[in-house]
Amino acid sequence: MAPSKDKKPKKAWSFTLDLTHPVEDGIFDSVNFEQFLKERIKVNGKTGNLGSIVHIGRLKSKITVSSEKKFSKRYLKYLTKKYLKKNNLRDWLRVVASDKETYELRYFQISQDDESESEE
């Protein structure tokens, strides 16, 4: 008789992208970005092959990507930066990790001191 193998519960990988500030300002389209992710995320080396392995959900200005297989948070950042570059938003927005499972889009900080000195 073969020894029984203990099946470990599958770990679900889940990451969140917080797009609150750019969406409220009207410079970022979350619906378009969600579609971009669905088309570009690779599963088993093929794009557009999400199937039942990867799920992408959108709730107002937050996008959640959950996967049954191992999924890299860094890959999500790479795709976000690629989208920003494609839509000429890379000069104004950056992708920042706000915690272990969340990325946030923030504006670059432009110092006001430099501008006020040059005006005087």
UniProtKB/Swiss-Prot annotation:
- Out of the domains of life, which is the source? Eukaryota
Q: Does Secreted appear among the keywords? A: no
Q: How is this protein named in the record?
A: Ribosomal protein eL22-like 1
Looking up Gene3D superfamilies in the UniProt record yields: 3.30.1360.210
Please report which protein family the annotation says this sequence is part of: Belongs to the eukaryotic ribosomal protein eL22 family.
Question: Do the record's keywords include Cell inner membrane?
Answer: no
Instruction: State the GO CC annotations.
Output: ribonucleoprotein complex; ribosome
Q: Which Pfam families match?
A: Ribosomal_L22e
Which taxonomic lineage is given here?
Eukaryota, Metazoa, Chordata, Craniata, Vertebrata
Q: Which organism is it from?
A: Xenopus tropicalis
Q: Name one GO biological process term.
A: translation
Q: Which gene encodes it?
A: rpl22l1
The record's section on InterPro entries has: Ribosomal_eL22, Ribosomal_eL22_sf
Q: Which GO terms describe its molecular function?
A: structural constituent of ribosome
Q: What's in the keyword line of the UniProt record?
A: Ribonucleoprotein, Ribosomal protein
